[in-house]
Amino acid sequence: MGFLFTSESVNEGHPDKLADQISDGILDACLEQDPDSKVACETATKTNMVMVFGEITTKAKVDYEAVVRQVCRDVGFISNETGLDGNNCRVLVELHDQSPDIGQGVHGMGTKSLEEIGAGDQGHMFGYATDETPELMPLTHVLATKLGHRLTVVRKDGTCPWVLPDGKTQVTIEYENEGGAMIPKRVHTILISTQHIEGVSNEKIAEDLMNEVIKKVVPEKYLDADTIFHLNPSGRFVIGGPDGDAGLTGRKIIIDTYGGWGAHGGGAFSGKDPTKVDRSGAYIARQVAKSIVAAGLARRALFQISYAIGVAQPLSIHVDTYGSGKIPDSEILEKVKEKFDFRAGMIGKSLDLKRGGNKRYQTTAAYGHFGRDDTDVFTWEKVVPL
């Protein structure tokens, strides 16, 4: 019997996503000059204001205000009409050194080797993969994410000049469960809410969203006469970005990962250097799950890993293939143990996570951290043979 499942996404102009990108833009700037930077950078934004705050220990010389303004411009916040004027808004900076109590426990204030470096905090992280898409990601999440990205493309290339930076998408798909594997049958509902300029008609909005966004993204085989479309259902979305809603780093963790599939340990990614296992642990967990499915060992896989602050080795690892495995989960776990080094410091080395700059981490902060094509940036998307 079929069932419905829904995933949502938000654009890079959503205030929470702007905050994520600013935090990761600052991480990039620090790592580019000093790969051993310790960064825990949060961002908050509201009307005409951006604040960055947290703990950073680095040898890098970074103009934090300049980074904030450049990220705002990159997204498209260039005037009050867009929701934030990145050139003239207030920028508040409250960044201080990492606590020495944390530093001595995690990296010995720089004296520990990579093999000895402990996890930056306690926590449990999950990786997920499914064979329902080429990306080995859930189709609900893939389509919601691609619709949001397409909204940004048509805004920036002029195809739909009435589109402004803020926006949200949501996709509901009818699935069937086939021996633990997820089989998408049809798209049940598509919801798009996009910020727009004053004066554009709802009819024009709906027409362009259908022709220039939905039909360019969603495969025709998933659409039918019964598919439901809600296109800017509120009727008006002129006030957006930080002018419409406050934004804060780390509030879109399900959008960042698997759209509600699998599981989530609760830790956000953006603004955190590789010693923070909230990020690095989740990245290698995705690589494990993806490698399991790519190897044909299972059609769907969930991998969990957990850590204690200051301890290099994980406390536990776990594999669940939802009954879709070709061999027992216990045997898959043994294969994983043979191929992966889960020590906190070694994850950063194997995935090249100390490499910042060129907007590497800023790029991860919008449109999902997983299922991305560029494995030079998204190194955790490389499959490890099992």
From Swiss-Prot:
**HAMAP family from the xrefs?**
S_AdoMet_synth1 (MF_00086)
- Descriptive protein name: S-adenosylmethionine synthase
| Cofactor info, note text | Binds 2 divalent ions per subunit. The metal ions interact primarily with the substrate. Can utilize magnesium, manganese or cobalt (in vitro). Binds 1 potassium ion per subunit. The potassium ion interacts primarily with the substrate.
Pathway in which this enzyme or protein is active: Amino-acid biosynthesis; S-adenosyl-L-methionine biosynthesis; S-adenosyl-L-methionine from L-methionine: step 1/1
Q: Which residues bind K(+)?
A: 42
Q: Which InterPro entries does the UniProt record give?
A: ADOMET_SYNTHASE_CS, S-AdoMet_synt_C, S-AdoMet_synt_central, S-AdoMet_synt_N, S-AdoMet_synthetase, S-AdoMet_synthetase_sfam
State its cofactor: Mn(2+); Mg(2+); Co(2+); K(+)
Instruction: Name the reaction it catalyses.
Output: L-methionine + ATP + H2O = S-adenosyl-L-methionine + phosphate + diphosphate
> Does Nucleotide-binding count among this protein's keywords?
yes
Which family does the record assign? Belongs to the AdoMet synthase family.
- Residues annotated to bind Mg(2+): 8
MF annotations from Gene Ontology: ATP binding; metal ion binding; methionine adenosyltransferase activity
Q: What CDD domains would the database entry show?
A: S-AdoMet_synt
Q: NCBIfam families recorded for this chain?
A: metK
Q: Where in the cell is it found?
A: Cytoplasm
Give residues annotated as binding L-methionine.
Answer: 55, 98, 245, 276
Which ranges does the record mark as transmembrane? none
What subunit structure does UniProt give?
Homotetramer.
Please state what class of enzyme this protein is: transferase
A UniProt-annotated Pfam family:
S-AdoMet_synt_C
Function statement: Catalyzes the formation of S-adenosylmethionine from methionine and ATP. The reaction comprises two steps that are both catalyzed by the same enzyme: formation of S-adenosylmethionine (AdoMet) and triphosphate, and subsequent hydrolysis of the triphosphate.
Q: Which SUPFAM superfamilies match?
A: S-adenosylmethionine synthetase (SSF55973)
Listed EC numbers: 2.5.1.6
Q: Which amino acid positions bind ATP, per UniProt? A: 14, 166-168, 234-237, 245, 251-252, 268, 272, 276
Task: Name the Gene Ontology biological process terms.
Answer: one-carbon metabolic process; S-adenosylmethionine biosynthetic process
Q: Spell out the PROSITE patterns in the cross-references.
A: ADOMET_SYNTHASE_1, ADOMET_SYNTHASE_2
